[in-house]
Amino acid sequence: MLINRKWAMPSSDTFDVPPIGEFVKSYLRQSKVSVDPFARNKRWATYTNDLNPDTAAEHHLDALEFLEMLRDTGTIADLVIFDPPYSARQVAECYQQVGRTVTMQDTQGKSWSDWKDAVAEIVPVGGIVLSFGWNTVGMGRKHNFEILEILMVCHGGVHNDTICMAERKTALQGNMFNETHLTKRAGDTATPSDNVAVLHK
């Protein structure tokens, strides 16, 4: 496991922080099919989504609906960029920005758990998930992932560090979901697209 610590000024857009942006791009360069369910204005991944319709993302669905749509269409992603709201307050702010009513379930841990379950369903053995937040929970052993790299970015003052994790899937999850569409390893022919993600500034 590789562990690094760097310093950078904070930004409301995670990937505009230079060391974090480079962390993401280093994995995108190796990816054929990538997914970003919380993309905001970044069109770096093959498939991008953000709940806010005023962003540049390709889709504007609830993150769980977006991930389930990809699963149901047979999409296999060798890389998922998982940068959700980091706290219940941030979830509430995101929903309020688009005029959506915030429920207790939205601000409880179940949202994060459901998102991770859905991510695991589109990532094959050998696939990578990049997780961002204030802790190192990540996808975890529950979803059969191992940690490859941790980058801690200090922002100084009273700001929380941003913790960036790269994890690799080591096995399927058995009968939790019909994962027959994930029998190919990352690096095999990907479906439905072999497009390499184009990095937009």
What kind of feature is each model-predicted range?
Residues 1-201:
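Class I S-adenosyl-L-methionine-dependent methyltransferase catalytic core
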